[in-house]
Swiss-Prot record:
Glycosylation sites per record: 58, 77, 98, 129, 140, 147, 230, 276, 285, 311, 319, 463, 469, 481, 501
Feature type site, description Cleavage: 362-363
Entry function: The surface protein (SU) attaches the virus to the host cell by binding to its receptor. This interaction triggers the refolding of the transmembrane protein (TM) and is thought to activate its fusogenic potential by unmasking its fusion peptide. Fusion occurs at the host cell plasma membrane. The transmembrane protein (TM) acts as a class I viral fusion protein. Under the current model, the protein has at least 3 conformational states: pre-fusion native state, pre-hairpin intermediate state, and post-fusion hairpin state. During viral and target cell membrane fusion, the coiled coil regions (heptad repeats) assume a trimer-of-hairpins structure, positioning the fusion peptide in close proximity to the C-terminal region of the ectodomain. The formation of this structure appears to drive apposition and subsequent fusion of viral and target cell membranes.
GO cellular component: host cell plasma membrane; membrane; viral envelope; virion membrane
Source organism (scientific name): Mouse intracisternal a-particle MIAE (IAP-MIAE)
Protein name per the record: Envelope glycoprotein
Extracellular compartment residues: 29-527
Record region (Fusion peptide): 364-384
Subunit structure: The mature envelope protein (Env) consists of a trimer of SU-TM heterodimers attached by noncovalent interactions or by a labile interchain disulfide bond.
PTM annotation: Specific enzymatic cleavages in vivo yield mature proteins. Envelope glycoproteins are synthesized as an inactive precursor that is N-glycosylated and processed likely by host cell furin or by a furin-like protease in the Golgi to yield the mature SU and TM proteins. The cleavage site between SU and TM requires the minimal sequence [KR]-X-[KR]-R.
Cytoplasmic-facing ranges: 549-584
């Protein structure tokens, strides 16, 4: 039974191969295949096209939220490069983005003076200390550490408007705005971040010590935008309470110190100037809104992104030192690297196919025939002009020669333009046909062959689009032999025009019956040759048409015989009689 099945399958394979030999097909071409890979997280680099979106696990923070996901061992030994990768660390050495707990505030317009003290012991300098109170929306959470040495002005892709919002009485007044004050977050300068809470450390509004270390005018509740070098950005606001923290609205007490130098002329400050101005927030004055405390809140990412977690360097990762999870809990792991799992990978494979994806492109035969016909007609007109030279009187011949020269000159210019126009038209037709073919192919995209972990599509690997090849072929065609012959024909035509234009007949030689008979015979001989050439061309076309019809009839007959043979195999009968018809 098994032998019979093998024999039947062998005959079926032979008939299938015979059938393939009768019709055009694509054999052994490379196709795009979709390979299902084993999940292996790859670090997200600074030049990645897409950055992940971060989520918090606390709904009350008013930020994007996801449920907490447990951790699992990494399952292998790997060495992950930290520099240039999107990774974070909590107050430790390494090349990841450093995060630290710090207090930041959005200082409102409500402000008042408490007291002022002055030191006038020096005649030229007066030191003034002003104690003030300031209303502020403050947050004690996780942020980038301050950097007093970075004064570089950067630019980020604008994913949100720049704006300043009114105080609406919220405890966490998150805005949908993006700050224009930007800084680098790593020493290799691969990631930029906004808002930079210290724009210029030397400005008088910067608080370098006290409860808040920041620029007095900055707004920490804007979008925390982290961007890579290729314009990919993400928001880090969900990391605010990853170590826990608190938030509230209160009034703080601060001290503003500055010195007045008397006797120094300044156009903007009359007879004195200010230097060494500093602002420092020293402590609470009174609480306006109750403080809200938050525990350590893990941050999560959505698949296909995940975290690779560790408490040591990522350069040496093992199954015991690194873990993977959708969420990062700093109470368990102080370092996290964002990774992405490429679940499906496109790969080129070589496989036989019975699909005829696209019909063959039309060549430029029609264009060449039209151009050659134009050249032939121009040459025939030139020959007719030569023949008519002796058939008319000498007086009219000079005028005819000049008119013929002008006409052929115009036709030469028109033929050159027509050549370029027809080439452009052919290219447009080929490009339109290619686009229709690609749309048809994409509309019917599926698995031509589906294996356990591999889907072989019908999309050709090298010839997915023929547009570039068509343009290249067009350029080669224009520079080929046909184009050279066409240019030679035009040059010969121009030479003939010049020769006709330089022809001047003597009136004494234009009379006589013998000369007229000779010219008439020459004229008749030229047109007889043109007629015979046309008859021969028509006969050749008829013979070619007959051969094509005969070939199509033979192919139709062979397909019917093969179909009958396949039907005989399915019914258990012998297909030998049908195969013998193919041999005959």
């Amino acid at each position: 039974m098994v032998q019979k099945m093998l024999t039947s399958r062998g005959l079926f394979l032979i008939l299938t191969m015979l059938n393939l030999s009768q019709v055009p097909s694509i054999m052994g071409e490379q196709r795009w295949a979709i390979l299902s890979t084993f999940p292996k997280p790859m670090p997200v680099r600074h030049d990645a096209i897409v950055f992940p979106k971060f989520f918090t696990t606390n709904k009350t923070v008013d930020l994007p939220y996801l449920l907490y996901d447990p951790t699992a061992p990494l399952g292998e030994n790997r060495s992950l490069l930290e520099q240039g990768s999107l990774c974070f660390q909590i107050n430790g050495p390494g090349n990841c983005i450093n995060l630290t707990a710090r207090a930041l505030g959005k200082f409102n317009e409500h402000r008042g003076w408490v007291s002022t003290t002055q030191d006038t012991s020096n005649v030229e300098i007066t030191f003034t200390n002003r104690t003030f109170w300031q209303e502020v929306n403050w947050v004690n959470g996780t942020f980038l550490p301050p950097n007093f040495s970075d004064k570089e002005h950067l630019h980020q892709p604008k994913i949100a408007p720049h704006c300043s919002l009114e105080d609406e009485g919220l405890i966490l007044p998150w805005s949908d705005c993006q700050s224009s004050i930007i800084r680098w977050v790593d020493q290799s300068k691969t990631f930029s971040f906004s808002p930079n809470m210290i724009d210029d450390p030397e400005k008088e509004f910067v608080m370098k010590k006290g409860l808040f270390i920041q620029d007095f005018r900055m707004h920490p509740f804007h979008k925390w935008v982290l961007c890579g070098v290729n314009g990919s950005c993400t928001e880090l606001n969900p990391l605010i309470f990853i170590q826990g923290g608190a938030v509230g609205k209160a009034s703080f007490t601060g001290i503003s110190r500055f010195a007045q130098y008397w006797g120094i002329h300044d156009a903007s400050q009359d007879s004195y100037g200010y230097t060494n101005t500093s602002v420092e927030i020293t402590g609470f004055n009174k609480t306006l809104v109750n403080q809200i405390n938050y525990p350590s809140t893990p941050v999560c990412v959505y698949p296909p992104f995940l975290f690779i977690l560790s408490n040591d360097s990522f350069e040496v990762c093992s199954n015991d030192s690194c873990w993977i999870s959708q969420c990062w809990d700093v109470t368990k792991n102080t370092r996290a690297m964002v990774a992405r799992i490429p679940r499906w990978i496109p790969v080129p494979v070589e496989t036989p196919s019975t699909l005829s994806m696209f019909r063959q492109k039309r060549d430029f035969g029609i264009t060449a025939a039209m151009i050659i016909a134009i050249s032939a007609s121009a040459a025939a007109a030139t020959a007719a002009g030569y023949a008519m030279v002796s058939a008319v009187s000498g007086t009219k011949l000079n005028q005819l020669s000049a008119d013929l020269a002008d006409a052929i000159t115009v036709q030469t210019s028109a033929s050159t333009k027509l050549k370029g126009g027809l080439m452009i038209l052919n290219q447009c037709l080929d490009l339109a046909e290619e686009q229709i073919g690609v749309l048809h192919q994409m509309a019917q995209l599926g698995c031509e062959r589906k294996l356990e972990a591999l889907c072989i599509t019908s999309v050709q690997y090298e010839n997915f689009t023929y547009a570039a090849n068509l343009s290249r072929q067009l350029s080669l065609y224009l520079a080929g032999n046909w184009s050279e012959r066409f240019d030679e024909t035009l040059e010969a035509l121009i030479a003939a025009v010049l020769k006709i234009n330089s022809t001047r007949m003597d009136l004494s030689l234009t009379e006589g019956l013998s000369s007229w008979i000779s010219s008439a015979f020459s004229y008749f001989k030229e047109w007889v040759g043109v007629g015979l050439f046309g008859v021969a061309t028509c006969c050749g076309l008829v013979v070619m048409l007959w051969l094509v019809c005969k070939l199509r009839t033979q192919q139709t007959r062979d397909k019917v015989v093969i179909t009958q043979a396949l039907a005989a195999i399915e019914q258990g009968a012998s297909p030998e009689i049908w195969l013998s018809m193919l041999k005959n």
